[in-house]
Structure formats: C-alpha cells, structure tokens
Amino acid sequence: MDWVRGETVGHGSFGKVSFAIQRSQSTLVSPSMVVKSSSASSSSTLMNEKIILNELKECPQIINCVGDSYTYENGEKLYNVLLEYASGGALSDKLKNSGDHRLPEFEVRKYAKGLLKGIHYIHKNGYVHCDIKLPNILLGEDDQVKIADFGLAKRSESTKDDKLRCELRGTPLYMSPEMVTRGEQETPADIWALGCVVAEMATGNPAWRCSDIAKLLMTIGLGDQLPEIPEKLSEEGKDFLEKCFVKDPKKRWTAEMLLKHPFVADQDDTVSLNDERCYSETPSTSPKCPFDFPDWVTNDSAESSATCSITSLPSPANFSDGSWSTSPAERIWELVCERKPESEWSTADGWVSVR
C-alpha cells in the first residue's frame, strides 16, 4: 500500500504513532489509518504484534492490521505497521474525560462484554494478550471496543517446561498472582486483568491503591488479599468481579464462561447466578459451563510508578532440576531486590500524546 505519514499522534518506548493517508486519497479526507513505527534494528516487538494481528483479523473487537512496510526517513530505516484508526480514542481517555472520572454501569457492562468477546477470540486462537489494560482498549467510531497493542502477546503454552521459560511481562497493576509468584502468563492472567479494568471503569481508580512496585508485587503475590470490589456496583457486577479475582487460575472463570454471566450476557444467553445444575462432584480439567468448578487440589496454599508496563523483568532463578525458586516469597524478592539494569525494565507506558 502506498501511503504518506501524517501528523504524529504520540510516541512511546517502542517508537511513534502517526496518522497515515493513502496517496490516492485527498489530504482533506479524514484519516482511516494510523502507522506505528520503530527503528528497524529494534522492531521485534512491533513485528510480533503484526504477525499476531494477522491471525486475529476476523474479530471486530480487535484492532485491524492493514499491512506493513519499511521506509527510510531522516537517514534511518523504519519498520511500520499500518492499523485501522480507532476514532473514539482509548478507553482510559474516556474515563479521564467523564464527569466524575468513572463510567455508569450500563457503559461498564457494554465495554466489558466487547472486551470479553475480543479476549475470547484471542484465547480461542491460542494466544494470550499479556497486557490488557485501559490504555490498550480503543473505541471505534461506533463506540465498539477494539483491543490493541499486541506487542507483548504470546502463544499460550501447554507444557510445564514452556512455562518455565516465561518472562515476567505486562503492567504491575494488572498482573495476576500466578504471574508474580510463578511466572505463569496464560489465559487466566488476561481474565484477572479484565477484572482490574472493570473495577477501574466502575470507580475511576486502579484496582490496587499502591504506588510502590515492590509493595504491589508482594500484595498481589502473597497472602489472601484481593482487589476491592466496588460497593456501587450491582450484585451482578460484584459477582462478575469475584469470578475474575480468583487466586487459583484453575478456578478462575474463562472468557467463554464470563460471556454467559448476567452482568454482560443478553437475556437469552444468561445463566442464573443461583443455577447450580452445572456443579460437578468430581474434578475436571475442562469446565463445561460457568458453574462447573470442582475443588481442585493445588500446591499453592495508585497510579505512579506502579503503572509502568514491563516487557522483561529479571527472570526467576532456575535450579538444576528446572524448578522455580523454593517459594513465592523468594521469587518476589528476586524481582524487587535483585533487579537487572534499568534498561531491562522496558516500559510501554512512556507514552506521550502530542495532540
């Protein structure tokens, strides 16, 4: 596709985002695309995003990738990914611009449902987003949710050995307990982050009130503390969040199950909160409905710096037998007290808007 770069929208640690216009269009036409660009020498994250978006292009709740190209600008070779333009902006901006910095419940329900549809499609196709948060949720012209920023996304893994190779990635305020304590970032981690997003939409505040990363990771990873459920939410909303904020990822509801929850489901799709017909007496590794949750046996008994997005934190120490540190506390200690150089704490939230 032959295109020209327009006005810069903003820039972050990965590079910059600008409007893009096809050469065949008049410059007076409203832009229908944006271009995400980074130096060709450090474009692996952007390339990963393009590959994954190509596989997820059939979902209306996921930002559409139009194409990619290389350009030479100001003596530098750039890698560019062309994306559809979400004219409604980021959901985080909508929240900030609302009257009391929170959304009415009918909008929370609408956006939660759209987000769930996108997450379900991502998971069904074998991927984990790894960085679900308000700034990465865009709104189209029709106010429809568009999940964006797949730079940290990865294939969902199926073996223990693969999980041991997982880096700590994402945004601390949205990280799941299993991500912090064991380095597991599979589909349940996206559901935990979804709960954080819903709580934030309902209150205007992050799910965790903590500005210190070390303290935040300790709170998420150790003990029984959970994010606070907003009092102003309906009983359906509170129950929805309780299904997202389950410490054990095996017992956390899946996107498919949550789509049938009364908080987001249409009347014909709703499963009653009091319906116990689907409970199972015996363990099952694959829940067949939202209420099929046996008692699995498990071995696991504010806004400032904590909002930074981490692409690669220090990996947990692997012992000769391939196991993690001997306890979650040791792993968290390694993360917060034995950091590698700051250059390895790559942040995606260094975004600066210029318009």
Question: Predicted regions span which residues?
Answer:
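Glycine-rich ATP phosphate-binding loop
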Residues: 16-40
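Structural motif in protein kinase domains
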Residues: 86-96
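Activation segment signature within eukaryotic-like protein kinase domains
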Residues: 111-112
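Catalytic-loop of the protein kinase fold
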Residues: 123-140
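Activation segment
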Residues: 152-154
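Terminal C-lobe "cap" of eukaryotic-type protein kinase domains
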Residues: 246-251, 255-270
